[in-house]
Structures are given as structure tokens and as C-alpha cells.
Amino acid sequence: MTARLRPELADIPAYTPGKTVPGAIKIASNETVHGPLPSVRAAIEKATDQLNRYPDNGYLELREHLASHLDKNLGAGAFTPEQIAVGCGSVSLCQQLIQITSSVGDEVIFAWRSFEIYPLQVRTAGATPVQVPLRDHTHDLDAMLAAITDRTRLIFVCNPNNPTSTVVDPAALKRFVEAVPPHILVVIDEAYVEYIRGDQVPGSFGLVRAHPNVVVLRTFSKAYGLAGLRIGYAVADADIVTALGKVYVPFSATSISQAAAIASIDAADELLARTDQVVAERDRVTAALREAGFTLPPSQSNFVWLPLAERTLDFVRRAAENRLVVRPYGEDGVRVTIAAPHENDAFLEFARNWIGQP
């Protein structure tokens, strides 16, 4: 190849998604088992009538729906459409946030392990990733504060954390945000927030209103079941939203994805009720794994984390032999999606047999 590419890209691996194996049970990508509601399907079908036209690049109708949805849940006037940005999945917004804050010589802090895309996107931008080890499978916020330097531009807090399934205590998160210098962007990545229960539900939108340097990311891929359409959003200060628009790939949020997201917002109560089924299965799977002898942190997501260390690859290999596709993370552990009950039963049968083997 004769084209001159950026030499630093040679050392940056491509993102590796969960595998899809025909005929196997895929519990590797944290997808919901529920398909779109009839009303969402109808909106998608209607949107196909206009596929010869470009989508709304300003996604105005979707932003208005999101603002109204937030008003309904947080109180009138919580956020305006000007405080909402839409992206091709929240992962694209992660990249945009890095682009508007960080370049060569700058630093971006995040926990490790956390979302695997963070270090790849940071390095692609030419910035330096600063990985702060987890403590008890969750963010060590004190250590993250200690990692801040005069080169820090952005901090990601993946909450619930992917892949370890844990959440940060809401009061601790509030103290953390208050302690971060106001010129540093704090991005709270809440792809799995709809699966949090009890007193661990974060008040992240309140943090956005109180602190102009805080951004909350949400997605329609998980609880809303639109992973195949790639659409997510950010809630932030209007100046940050304006900056995000400058690095947005034009028309990347398609007409179909916008229509599906709007219909999903209209059906939010019905869609989010489905998460109760997932949570019930999560609790059942967690209890069964612990009873079988596994050690795992309490999950507040639609997946569980098995910190298997040096036994990780053996677990993954043997699972594949049993037509189960799980997600390995080096020799740290395995992430397992909560699926349909019969799929969870198949996984539990394998897991019980595996842990009893030498």
C-alpha cells in the first residue's frame, strides 16, 4: 500500500464487537430480547416513504420530543431542545466530545476496565488516555480526582459501568462532580441507566443543570431496543451542544432512526416496563451463579460480570463449544448479557457444569 496513513494508527486496534455465530445463543452484546413495538414498527415503515430525502440534520422534532419527555419526568422547563444533541448512537457522541475538547498533548481520564471504545477514540484524536483502575469493580472516584493534571480536558464516568455492571453511589458522584475543576468536561455515560433499581438511581440531569461542564449521554440501543438503528443523545449546556454540532457527521442520524426514536419516546412507559422483566431475570441469574460458586459484583445493568481472571479464556472457549457466545475481556473476566429465560437457563446449565470442572 502506497497511501501515507497516520503512523500512530498502526498501534491502535479496531473496536471488537461481540461475535455473532449462526445457531448459537448470543449473550455477548447487551442487546434486548424484545423487538420493536407495533407503534414503532409503524413509524419505521412510514419513514421509508421519504427515503429519497435527506434526514433532518438538526433533528428538531426529535429534540423537541426529548425535551418534552424530560419535562414530564423532571418538571416543566427542565431542558430546552438547544440543550440536546443527537448522534449516531451515544458512541458517536463520545467521539464528538473528545473531538471538541482534546487533541495532541491533552489527557482524557476514565476508569479501567470500562467501555472499550474510550481509549481507542482518545488515541485516534491524538490525545492521551489516562486509565484509572477500578476498585471493587466500580469507579474509584478519589483516584480519578487524583489523576487530574493541567492537561486533563475530559473525564468519562460510565454509569452503570460496562463491562462490570456496577454503579457509582449518587452522593459520591455528586461530590466528585463538585470537586472537578469547572473547565474539565465530565461526561456521565448512562447507556444502561434504565436498569438501575433502588436508591442507586443517579440524579445526573440535576448535575447538568447545576454544573455547565457536565454532560449526560443516553441511548436508544438498550432499553428502547433500537440497537440496529444507531441513535443516542446528549443533554448538556447549550454551548457544548453547539460545539458538538460542529463535529457531527452530517445526516448520520437517519430519517428512520429519528422516526423510531420519536415513536419510542411516545411509548416510553410501555418500553421501560420491559426492563422489569430483565431485572427479574438478572436477579435470578445472579442468585443462581452465586449459588453455583461464582463470585460477581451486584449488577445494575442488563448483564452480569464474572471476574474469572486467568480462567476467562477457558470459560469462553467451553461456552462456545456449548453454542453460547459470551464477551471476554482479556484475562480480566467475562460479560454475560441477560437474555430470554430459556437462554439464561442454557447459560446457567453450562456455568454450573464448568465451575465444577478442574
UniProtKB/Swiss-Prot annotation:
A biological process term (GO) from this entry: L-histidine biosynthetic process
A GO molecular-function annotation: pyridoxal phosphate binding
PROSITE patterns the UniProt entry points to: AA_TRANSFER_CLASS_2 (PS00599)
Cofactor needs: pyridoxal 5'-phosphate
SUPFAM superfamilies hit by this protein: PLP-dependent transferases
Modified residues (N6-(pyridoxal phosphate)lysine): K222
This enzyme's EC code(s): 2.6.1.57
Catalyzed reactions per annotation: an aromatic L-alpha-amino acid + 2-oxoglutarate = an aromatic oxo-acid + L-glutamate
Keyword terms of this UniProt record: Aminotransferase, Pyridoxal phosphate, Transferase
Coiled-coil stretches: none
This protein's record includes keyword Transferase: yes
EC category name: transferase
Protein's UniProt keywords contain rRNA processing: no
Top-level taxon of origin: Bacteria
Purpose: Aminotransferase that catalyzes the conversion of aromatic amino acids and 2-oxoglutarate into corresponding aromatic oxo acids and L-glutamate.
PANTHER family associated with the record: HISTIDINOL-PHOSPHATE AMINOTRANSFERASE (PTHR43643:SF3), HISTIDINOL-PHOSPHATE AMINOTRANSFERASE 2 (PTHR43643)
Quaternary structure (record): Homodimer.
Record-stated family: Belongs to the class-II pyridoxal-phosphate-dependent aminotransferase family.
Name this protein carries in UniProt: Aromatic amino acid aminotransferase
